[in-house]
Amino acid sequence: TGIQYTLEDYLKGQDGVRQIDMSVDGTITGEYITKEAVAGNNVTLTIDANLQKETEKILKDNIHKLASGKYGEKYDANAGAAIVMNVKTGEILALASYPDYEPELFINGISEKKLAEYNKGKNLYNRAISGTYAPGSTFKMVVATAALETGTITTKTQINDTGLYPRGYHPACWYYTQYHYGHGYLNIKQAIQKSCNYFFYELGYRMGIDPVIEYAKKFGLGNKTGIELSGEEDGIVELKDYCKEVTGVDWQFGDTLSAVIGQSYNSYTPIQMARYISMIANGGKQIDVTLIKAITDSEGNQISKEKIEQTVNSKLGIDNSTTVKSLDVKEETLATIRKGMKGVTSEYGGTAYYIFSDFGMDIAGKTGSAETGQDNKVNGWFTGFAPYDDPEIAVVVLIENAGSGGNTAPTAKEIMQAYFGMNAKKVTEDVTAIPSTQTAR
């Protein structure tokens, strides 16, 4: 399964042939090798074994904390994914999906009871690459990029959040729903920091949905990353086409209002989100998502990247459409977005400030809370990168039914602490101090 399946041709080697001559009475008269055995190739993965182990444990533990009420309120959290990616190379340092499974149980035949248990919990389903989810407010950086690059706004443009948005179906910012007044005048950096829905509703009104879709695609959303694992999904980025296909009705302004805060038909995998955040962190540079550091033959010769790609693409049926080009955007655009993401974690009013205010390092992040359409359940996202000034890693965490993105942030914090070798200060009681979180924040 997994990477072993993809790289089977490189790993298995070739059997040798030994010929044995025998006399009529069964006596061996000669023995020699007619074909030498060829050892399999050596595959070095990008995965950091210690970080992988820690990431799996941190994800599992925090899901259980949410489900048990350790953070103050019980949620139906029962599944999720977490990814750590090198923002400069696209190398995967850790990739976890929960619930997971024990591969060794399949070697001698898994019991029907255990298999039924796995099927019920979708343990064999890799949520990091196969799960597609509405991104919630983590999508706002796409909308911000589109607005700045199309000239819809500048970095100095201010929009007054009065609470209830006056157009369309009159949606309210989460802040108004919670506190009964708006954020007031905000610029784009502040709108990202405070995750102001009203601000982004207005951007949707001013520029429409087409530029948003265009820049979502430029960030690689809705498009497979080409990671060397089977089962990767595309997601949904062609929002207007999909709307027409499933409803038979053309796209409406109300759909735009929902889409710009990461709802509507937006649907992306955690691995796509990790690539997207990495591109924000590295200044928009193209990266190739990969699990393979190197493959060498039995004599120590390194196999070319091109040859490996051809083999993997053929095995998994991948074409070159997974390649995302470097973003052709103004330097100021991504710099402004990064500042907004820094404010999320380091400035009062930032939606993850209560979690990261004591982190000891400047980082950037964005929370996201996305309605699932099922019994008022909300998935939680945290996407971010660190360090802020010279980014090394992007961390993406998705927890199903977490209640909010704020509830997902502690998982990302602990993963970052594990990567940087910090003495992880478990965030438990402190999380109860976070204001209750509304949808799409």
Give the label of every model feature segment.
Residues 281, 413-424:
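Short amphipathic alpha-helical signal-transduction/dimerization elements
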Residues 61-69, 98, 343, 421:
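Conserved helix-loop functional segments at active or binding sites
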Residues 48, 52, 273, 404-413:
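Short, charged, low-complexity patches
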Residues 23-34, 47, 80, 87-137, ...:
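Beta-lactam-recognizing serine transpeptidase/beta-lactamase-like catalytic domain environment
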Residues 428-441:
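Short, highly charged C-terminal tails/helix-capping segments
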Residues 28-80:
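Conserved, well-ordered alpha-helix/loop/beta-strand core segments that scaffold catalytic motifs
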Residues 52, 66, 132, 401-404:
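Short strand->helix junction
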Residues 1-40, 57, 274, 346:
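Small/polar-residue-rich segments within soluble enzyme cores
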